[in-house]
Swiss-Prot record:
Main location: secreted
Protein name in the entry: Hrp pili protein HrpA
Location in or out of the cell: Secreted; Fimbrium
Similarity section: Belongs to the HrpA type 1 family.
Keywords annotated in UniProt: Fimbrium, Secreted, Virulence
The organism of origin for this protein: Pseudomonas savastanoi pv. phaseolicola (Pseudomonas syringae pv. phaseolicola)
Stretch forming the signal peptide: none
Amino acid sequence: MNIMSSLTNAGRGVVNTVGGAAQGINSVKSSADRNIALTKNTGSTDSIDATRSSISKGDAKSAELDGTANEENGLLRETSMLAGFEDKKEALSNQIVASKIRNSVVQF
């Protein structure tokens, strides 16, 4: 290895080290900027605390409405099932009546 290639390699090492350090600093700065932006966009803790109560009440009301909807859906399914049974019962009754009529007709 001659002196020029040694100097070139050393120069590359210095450039790579400086470049890596600059990238690291830039990454730290970007992360800090991102965290600051997130904090600014979420509002102050006062605004969060002020809305927390109404959000909690809204969640409770939503859960109550979900429970009511589930009960109503259960009743609707039960009603539909009973209507289906009645429909089948009526169809069976009609078949029985039709069969009795066919059996009672005298063939000439």
